[in-house]
């Protein structure tokens, strides 16, 4: 029996792992001393999937449309002043920049492309 992975509840975990592997490969190749970690509030109410040094906070969402609720962890991270840029990697079809919050929403292909090219907003 064929089952489409996009229809599985586990797809979000697979998707987050895929983004992690790309980040880890990139950092190992270009910035071997850079650290990647998870950020979470003291009580665990909010978290951000990946924090790359003091440069980048990344939330990964397998959703086809990122909603305001998906941004809660990034908003809290911004309040802490830990990173310079905030990003959501998603399954959305187009890039968006939420200017009022200075958060970029990337389709995963665009994010991976910009990451490896070392050009674009991520690198400004």
Question: Language-model features: where?
Answer:
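A cross-kingdom feature that marks ATP-driven nucleic-acid transaction machinery
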Residues: 1-124
């Amino acid at each position: 029996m064929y089952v489409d992975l996009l229809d599985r509840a586990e797809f979000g975990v697979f998707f987050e792992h895929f983004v992690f592997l790309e980040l880890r490969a990139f950092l190992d190749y270009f910035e071997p001393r850079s650290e990647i970690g998870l950020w979470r509030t003291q009580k665990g109410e909010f978290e951000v999937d990946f924090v790359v040094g003091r440069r980048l906070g990344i939330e990964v969402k397998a959703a086809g449309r990122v909603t305001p609720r998906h941004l809660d962890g990034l908003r809290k991270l911004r309040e802490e002043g830990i990173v310079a840029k905030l990003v959501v990697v998603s399954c959305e079809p187009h890039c968006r920049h939420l200017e009022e919050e200075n958060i970029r929403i990337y389709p995963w292909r665009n994010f991976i492309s910009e990451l490896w090219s070392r050009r674009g907003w991520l690198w400004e």
